[in-house]
Amino acid sequence: MRLSQQLFVTLREDPAEAEIPSHKCLVRAGYIRRIGSGIYAYLPLMWRVLQKVSQIVREEMNKAGAQECLLPQLQPAELWQESGRWDTYTKAEGIMFALTDRQNRELGLGPTHEEVITAVARDLIRSYRQLPVNLYQIQTKFRDEIRPRFGLMRGREFIMKDAYSFNLDEECLKKTYQAMDIAYRNIFRRCGLAFRAVEADSGAIGGSASQEFMVLADAGEDEVLFTADEKYAANVEKAVSLPADKVASPFKKFAKKETPNTNTIESLAKFLDCAATAIVKNVLYEVVYDSGITVLVLVSIRGDQEVNEVKLQNELVRQASRYNAKTILALKIPDAAAQQKWATKPLPLGYIGPDLEDNLLKKASDIAPQFLRIADNTVTDLENLITGANETGFHLVGANWGKDFILPELIVDLRKAQVGDRAIHDPNQTLQSARGIEVGHIFQLGYKYSQAMNAFYTNEAGESTPICMGCYGIGVSRLAQAAVEQSYDKDGIIWPVAIAPYQAIVVIPNLADAEQVKTAESLYNELNQAGIETLLDDRDERAGVKFKDADLIGIPYRIVTGKSLKSGKVELVERASKKASEVAINEVVSYLKTAISKVNASD
């Protein structure tokens, strides 16, 4: 392709809306253009990158036995109501674009396709002889993000590969899941990315197990906790660890103590001259279920720990049936104003104890009559503990479970793992932290959707059995930007060879020099004929502008038909290393073929 004929506009200044380097680079280099909040046009160079990523994805999915299809973007609300996710996606999380057609039917623009594909399977899969089967698509998805940002990282419209497997049973699912794990690792390696596979929370998708694939980058939105021995890695939302050893309480007798101005753990520990590990803090949450019931949740956790609200949300979803509900619509820590809806009197925030009385809750049909009390594992073995006295300015000391108040029946791991914690698999290993960009996620869904939507098959014994499902996603457009976030410098993008829009660019420094033009045209044709995708910068611009643009757009190899022509050579510059070499004109093709094959082999 000749740059003089391409829609190609670069910017010298960073765009005002761009916050992270990859976003700045892609806009400045003319790859993407903002159309609206979280909405971008993929310009010709970007489209070539996306096609290359998609092709690598397609090849590895096909090799793993998956079959490509295309599902509708418009999805009937009825399917999502069958699965129980319509309210979650349109009200609780509010990420689905929902609309009503002229027949007054509700529809959603697909953020994901579990319901649609399950409906297809329900209609078409009848016998065990048809299983397992794995279907995938590459298409545009839609999410009504609260705060679209970072370009293609968190947009309202994005390209994704999503696959869905239908399996005989859990054992069969594990085999497919493993095949997808291998395929994903191959995809990310071939794309030239440094990545880490980590344990992950399944979120609104659901399922028994899931794993994320993180591209390591300082600007990553996710925190990954891992050990140096490479035997453990997890998203902080999912991570588990051993808490720090507790320090014994200095109080041996039960007493109520006046503790003015101690509504934080730090101030209380300082006032009482005790360790935070001897304190039980009680965190109050307000949760609204899709049945319309508001439940007040009291979480008791050790003073030196923080509540992992993702773990808490998952536990509250598991408790939904107690309140004739399927999911939660909202979860928050209530402030004084919010309490007026359900509290008979203001609560002593900062001084709450685990025995906060239920009669503080107003009697109303939409308010649960009792607190849902949950204890984190860290508090169960504490003795002579310190906690709130349910009175502003007072705490209890020397208290014990079973004697001074009842230990909640619901005991769950709700603590947030932290850097420096000891690892469960080896206490000699401590958790370290890195930032990551999630580019892939695989789930063992199990029977969640097949049972909810009545997708059954007949097994060998003639019995009707729910299909065991898995789902597997890759953010194609996000992956492309993540590659930039991982590999750039002050001059612009450094594309991995495998997904670069072009592998080489031939630059003519001076269009008035007939020899430069002739040699460039010849090399341009030879390289393309040899299968090396090559750009020709034949624009009527100064040489400095062309060199800057070549660096900015990140083409892996730059060939310059300049002063070296006098000795029958051209200058060849590697974008990644900036190493410049003089190569004989008749050796350029073989030189680049060798260089590219070495890079591809290492990936």
Swiss-Prot record:
The keyword Nucleotide-binding applies. It catalyses: tRNA(Pro) + L-proline + ATP = L-prolyl-tRNA(Pro) + AMP + diphosphate. GO terms for molecular function: aminoacyl-tRNA deacylase activity; ATP binding; proline-tRNA ligase activity. GO terms for biological process: prolyl-tRNA aminoacylation. It is found in: Cytoplasm. It holds the Pfam family HGTP_anticodon. Keywords: Aminoacyl-tRNA synthetase, ATP-binding, Cytoplasm, Ligase, Nucleotide-binding, Protein biosynthesis. GO terms for cellular component: cytosol. InterPro entries: aa-tRNA-synt_IIb, aa-tRNA-synth_II, aa-tRNA-synth_II/BPL/LPL, Anticodon-bd, Anticodon-bd_dom_sf, Pro-tRNA-ligase_IIa, Pro-tRNA-synth_IIa_bac-type, Pro-tRNA-Synthase_IIa_type1. Its main location: cytoplasm. Its EC number is 6.1.1.15. Signal peptide: none annotated. Belongs to the class-II aminoacyl-tRNA synthetase family. ProS type 1 subfamily. Catalyzes the attachment of proline to tRNA(Pro) in a two-step reaction: proline is first activated by ATP to form Pro-AMP and then transferred to the acceptor end of tRNA(Pro). As ProRS can inadvertently accommodate and process non-cognate amino acids such as alanine and cysteine, to avoid such errors it has two additional distinct editing activities against alanine. One activity is designated as 'pretransfer' editing and involves the tRNA(Pro)-independent hydrolysis of activated Ala-AMP. Homodimer. Consists of three domains: the N-terminal catalytic domain, the editing domain and the C-terminal anticodon-binding domain. This is Proline--tRNA ligase. It comes from Microcystis aeruginosa (strain NIES-843 / IAM M-2473).
